[in-house]
């Protein structure tokens, strides 16, 4: 339980359903933002046989797991279902669900489903190779992970499903539909389909028409924090919530995470450190990157958009390093009763800033239009075991994650004019005290770490509360409920060192991309259609 406040004015509670890439959670909060209990279940998104790149979302099993989590959360909280005043859902973005004309879900895919690589290439050729730019100028998205190539794939290979489709939503909206029977999308999540206008925050049907796709499958758009419907008797029997409980529009996981962190005003900046790292900047008005390096998403705050860059597999890289090379440290940490990452950070803290020049090659900065990475490697190693060892490599990985984040924030500042004056650092990465200090040193601005680091569910609960009048507004509530654990001030002595390290890394990374281009090495990840 995260302790923000020990007093609750009433016995009212809110539930957030958080459908992530690797798991689903049902989280109960009191009205002061304290997490009371959570039920969690891992889920898998398996490939379809003989469909390369596919990542199917199992609608039947995943609803059963969601119901299991809801019941588990209520049990752990020792609360009756009547104590839940409202529920809202959030999810990974990009994942879509199709329904037939009676409203029954018939097909879904998860966020990084890459089956439509050929269709991405096909769509890029439209309008003398200008269609992707048109999509980006309208929606802030490129085609790689958008919905249109996936719909075109269905038209090509599963015309039975394509013909049956009556409505399209996101995965968060599917959860809300399973609870309430109502169908709608919110701008923050639906914006990642590449079919929503950043300015109007509504669908742009002509984009589908230009792609030769049906434009009659677009569901109503409702803003985050508005009432959608109520838990049906059928859903109540399945999940354990009380029939009639209000169901409120949720949204995309990153945007609701920013709400839970109080990142609700223009100019505010967050770095969300999970499996992927997102660098998010609130923009004063909808603008796009003329170089198409950065995605632009609708925020859950009406009228606001966010520039978002993504570092690939940052958290996954740290886990790989821990599991592949640090068996001794894992055993020692277990004996000491501490987290292995904490032990590795203690070791890395004794390594000088700059990690003796070791350069990790993993994620590139974000280049949304042509998005791929070099082959994973370490460059500039030494044979001196005093200088090149596990502690050095671990520090180098933490420094590199901060360097990539700083490069992404610089790209955003270049086209938007918005330069971060401070950074909110959240997610699992923010648990690292050394990592937080390194991020401050590399970016050159103060880094604030919140008490609640996994803030997506809290933001979702805030939306639920606003929808039933328990909170006044999204932005004011997000600001009021966030609590700060600590702040890190940049060490100016490290500024020149990290600037040089960043310049050197950028040059070396460019050379490493050349090896991928020549077919000599294998990219860490490559977007569909490249």
Curated annotation (Swiss-Prot):
Matching SUPFAM superfamilies: Actin-like ATPase domain
Top-rank lineage group of the source organism: Bacteria
InterPro entries attached to this UniProt entry: AI-2_kinase (IPR033676), ATPase_NBD (IPR043129), Carb_kinase_FGGY (IPR000577), FGGY_C (IPR018485), FGGY_Carb_Kinase (IPR050406), FGGY_N (IPR018484)
GO biological process: carbohydrate metabolic process; quorum sensing
Cell location: Cytoplasm
Protein family: Belongs to the FGGY kinase family.
Annotated PANTHER family: AUTOINDUCER-2 KINASE (PTHR43095:SF1), SUGAR KINASE (PTHR43095)
Name of this chain's protein: Autoinducer-2 kinase
Gene: lsrK
Function: Catalyzes the phosphorylation of autoinducer-2 (AI-2) to phospho-AI-2, which subsequently inactivates the transcriptional regulator LsrR and leads to the transcription of the lsr operon. Phosphorylates the ring-open form of (S)-4,5-dihydroxypentane-2,3-dione (DPD), which is the precursor to all AI-2 signaling molecules, at the C5 position.
Lineage summary: Bacteria, Pseudomonadati, Pseudomonadota, Gammaproteobacteria, Enterobacterales
């Amino acid at each position: 339980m995260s302790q923000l406040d020990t007093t609750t004015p009433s016995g009212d509670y809110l539930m957030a359903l958080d459908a992530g890439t690797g798991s689903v959670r049902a989280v109960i909060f009191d009205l002061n933002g304290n997490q009371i209990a959570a039920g969690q279940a891992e889920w898998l998104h398996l490939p379809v046989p003989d469909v390369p790149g596919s990542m199917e979302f199992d609608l039947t099993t995943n609803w059963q797991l969601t119901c299991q989590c809801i019941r588990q959360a209520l049990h752990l909280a020792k609360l009756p279902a009547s104590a839940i005043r409202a529920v809202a859902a959030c999810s990974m973005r990009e994942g879509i669900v199709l329904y037939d004309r009676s409203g029954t879900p018939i097909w879904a895919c998860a966020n990084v489903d890459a089956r439509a690589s050929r269709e991405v290439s096909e769509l890029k050729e439209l309008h003398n190779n200008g269609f992707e730019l048109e999509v980006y100028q309208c929606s802030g998205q490129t085609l790689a992970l958008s919905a249109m190539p996936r719909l075109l794939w269905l038209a090509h290979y599963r015309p039975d499903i394509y013909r049956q489709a009556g409505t399209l939503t996101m995965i968060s909206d599917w959860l809300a539909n399973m609870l309430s029977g109502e169908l709608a999308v919110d701008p923050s999540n639906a914006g990642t389909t590449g079919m929503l206008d950043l300015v109007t925050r509504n669908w742009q049907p002509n984009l589908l028409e230009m792609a030769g796709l049906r434009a009659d499958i677009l569901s109503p758009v409702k803003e985050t924090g508005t009432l959608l419907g109520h838990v049906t008797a059928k859903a109540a029997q399945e999940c354990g919530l009380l029939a009639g409980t209000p169901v409120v529009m949720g949204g995309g996981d990153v945007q609701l995470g920013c709400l839970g962190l109080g990142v609700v005003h223009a100019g505010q900046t967050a770095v969300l450190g999970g499996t992927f790292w997102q660098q998010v900047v609130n923009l004063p008005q909808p603008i796009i990157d003329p170089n198409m390096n950065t995605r632009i998403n609708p925020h859950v705050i009406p009228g606001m958009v966010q520039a978002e860059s993504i570092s690939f597999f940052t958290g996954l890289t740290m886990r790989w390093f821990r599991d592949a090379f640090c068996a001794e440290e894992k055993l020692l940490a277990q004996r000491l009763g501490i987290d292995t990452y904490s032990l590795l950070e203690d070791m890395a803290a004794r390594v000088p800033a700059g990690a003796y020049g070791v350069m990790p090659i993993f994620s590139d900065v974000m280049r949304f239009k042509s998005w791929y990475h070099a082959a994973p490697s370490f460059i500039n190693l030494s044979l001196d075991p005093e200088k090149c060892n596990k502690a050095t490599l671990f520090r180098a990985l933490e420094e590199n994650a901060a360097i990539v984040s700083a490069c992404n924030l610089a790209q955003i500042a270049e086209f938007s004019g918005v330069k971060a004056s401070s950074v909110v650092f959240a997610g699992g990465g923010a648990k690292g005290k050394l990592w937080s200090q390194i991020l401050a040193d590399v970016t050159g601005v103060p880094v604030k770490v919140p008490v609640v680091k996994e803030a997506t569910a809290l933001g979702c609960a805030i939306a639920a509360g606003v929808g039933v009048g328990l909170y006044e507004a999204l932005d004011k509530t997000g600001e009021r409920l966030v609590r700060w654990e600590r702040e890190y001030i940049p060490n100016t002595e490290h500024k020149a060192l990290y600037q040089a390290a960043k310049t050197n890394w950028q040059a070396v990374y460019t050379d490493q991309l050349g090896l991928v281009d020549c077919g000599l090495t294998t990219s860490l990840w490559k977007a569909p259609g490249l």
